[in-house]
């Protein structure tokens, strides 16, 4: 039975039971900001279940398009390497909105599976929530499923209702028990029944889940019976198709085989079992349906997820040898397969192909260079024996060559390498901060204005009255702004400082008799024309109105503290590090100061402390700040510091604060004591020869110090020592750790030797050579290597594969003694085993390594080594 027939039969069956066939909703959730993509059949009925929406039917059935490739539900990294992970899938479902309940839902499911689909009853197993006696009795007494095949699933670790068989929409709201139906693939496949220690195997596969919403959970965790219980069910079309078509992997069903053959045609790959073909076949579905539903590739949100999926598919095509756009040519094959069920896909076919082609061509323009960098880094790592890919390099690939992190991680995973995600995130955060600072309210020079200049009074006062000279909305001049309008106001007089010299623009309020305007930022439209950017909170504003302008005094004061301390810090850095220190950039806002400066080496803790001491000494001196306007020549003669490359006018403003004297047009404290306290919170490099310091002042510095004190006190409490003894105690602990690590290494070496002796007896003779494939409990890669070397010495002429499992990942190592490498290659052997456990690997003829993500298949993979070796000896 083909997938299309299964879909049709499911919908028609429930239609015959009084259900309304409802079209799939869009993959972009409607009015639900909590969801990135539609990921379940019940999403479109969420408000119906919550009682916020009413439908003209009380029973419904759907085949819902779903995507899981971002956020909490993210299957992307597993796609192509397991039998059942997909980015796009179809969820068949039937729903009851206060109509039928457990009896009918269970009866319908059993009738469809056993009578309509013809599944053998003895192949079906069932789970129910441990306390759901009603469902248990229906299954055992009415349906007649033997009690040994109906399994009660309890709460995880005793936490009430924390069970795989109890569904909750959230911490509060509708919830209830569920019953799941499993298909038994037979004893030839490893795995145990649900609830057993081996339940993660592939023998018993869940095909249908029936959720019974019968309670409403309140904030106290109390369950209240719902007056009209409901039913929400879901059955993956791909999973049930695999069962009905008598195949074990979803990728073997007719729907996927069509797309896999199409991908093979376009890439020239002859191996239809290639994981890369599976990736491409899966991803063309997700990408095409997302584009058809209005998502376009971008750099954030849904668009970024789409771009990641497209580029992952392209990378796998590149891996198979494609060097030009190929992915978009699969769209007609997909439309032929799925267009009849989803007319929106057929209607959008041309647009889908066009969007994919453009994205492909854009990425193919850079992928060659990006892959070269990636391969060079991996080769260098292999030489050095490193297993962690540099996060900065991963970010360069992302930023320069368009390689999303998960694409780089995907390539690394194939080599059993992990990416330093923390370093990547740090690089990303730095770039975002730079972009935010550079692009915030960029309205300068892009608004057309002809009129008087703005007179700035913000050095003397925070309040001023001014007349509206111009108004802008959506970048165009207007005569008035209405309540709720976002726009820009130009005044003839203002106390608001416009962003300049690294200091952010002021925020505050413009108030008139007819309306109030909240100023969110202030920027210069022209050199002496100030634009107040914000929103009309109440009433209206019109050109010619007189307004009272008031700056947010607290924000201005915080900004002034941070700006003034930046001058003092600059001076202190030159004293501590040398006269070569020059400002390369700054960003001053109410929260902190960020200062970039020329220097080649990281600051030592002692240098940071010295800078802090110098600045805080200036603060304690409480010296008055003096600002004077003078000619540029007089400023130079006075010794005022000027920034290299900066253009100055004939007249400049010179700020003297403490021992610092610089040209500056910003706002500052009246006395150094107003700064209160200065603390450096971070120091690091941002470019070759450029360092960055971030610092806080005043109340923010006090809060920072208090937080550090709290942390030290917490650590001292954990260590049961006084705060001033923490460092000594940690040093002692580290000494113990190092000693234990050395002892562990010695024990592992002894373990390898002892295991090697035990494993020798397990080797079997095949045509004059010894063949051994075994798993070592608790071993790491180093132990596997050491054990392999010892076994090769002991067995003399041998073919060996050793494996270990840790944190759900498989590590493999293969070895072939030198007398056999003409016939057998360790790289080919380890790759054969790795492919069976969801991985890939390679290496030298005599020794090779690999990794995998599917430990469930490891026993069978190891068992295949003997036959592989026998065929080649």
Swiss-Prot record:
Reaction(s) the record says it catalyses: tRNA(Ala) + L-alanine + ATP = L-alanyl-tRNA(Ala) + AMP + diphosphate
SMART domains per the UniProt record, alphabetical: tRNA_SAD
Entry-linked PROSITE patterns: AA_TRNA_LIGASE_II_ALA (PS50860)
Leading EC class: ligase
Record bears the keyword tRNA-binding: yes
Main localization category: cytoplasm
Biological processes, Gene Ontology terms: alanyl-tRNA aminoacylation; negative regulation of DNA-templated transcription
Keywords from the named record: Aminoacyl-tRNA synthetase, ATP-binding, Cytoplasm, Ligase, Metal-binding, Nucleotide-binding, Protein biosynthesis, RNA-binding, tRNA-binding, Zinc
InterPro entries, sorted: aa-tRNA-synth_II/BPL/LPL (IPR045864), Ala-tRNA-lgiase_IIc (IPR002318), Ala-tRNA-ligase_IIc_anticod-bd (IPR018162), Ala-tRNA-synth_IIc_core (IPR018165), Ala-tRNA-synth_IIc_N (IPR018164), Ala-tRNA_ligase (IPR050058), Ala_tRNA_ligase_euk/bac (IPR023033), DHHA1_dom (IPR003156)
Note accompanying the cofactor annotation: Binds 1 zinc ion per subunit.
UniProt-recorded Gene Ontology molecular function terms: alanine-tRNA ligase activity; aminoacyl-tRNA deacylase activity; ATP binding; tRNA binding; zinc ion binding
Top-level taxon of origin: Bacteria
UniProt EC number: 6.1.1.7
Residues reported to bind Zn(2+): 563, 567, 664, 668
Subcellular location(s) of the protein: Cytoplasm
CDD domains: AlaRS_core (cd00673)
Family: Belongs to the class-II aminoacyl-tRNA synthetase family.
Function: Catalyzes the attachment of alanine to tRNA(Ala) in a two-step reaction: alanine is first activated by ATP to form Ala-AMP and then transferred to the acceptor end of tRNA(Ala). Also edits incorrectly charged Ser-tRNA(Ala) and Gly-tRNA(Ala) via its editing domain.
Free-text comment on this protein's domains from its UniProt entry: Consists of three domains; the N-terminal catalytic domain, the editing domain and the C-terminal C-Ala domain. The editing domain removes incorrectly charged amino acids, while the C-Ala domain, along with tRNA(Ala), serves as a bridge to cooperatively bring together the editing and aminoacylation centers thus stimulating deacylation of misacylated tRNAs.
Protein name (record): Alanine--tRNA ligase
Source species taxonomy: Bacteria, Pseudomonadati, Pseudomonadota, Betaproteobacteria, Rhodocyclales
Gene name, Swiss-Prot/TrEMBL: alaS
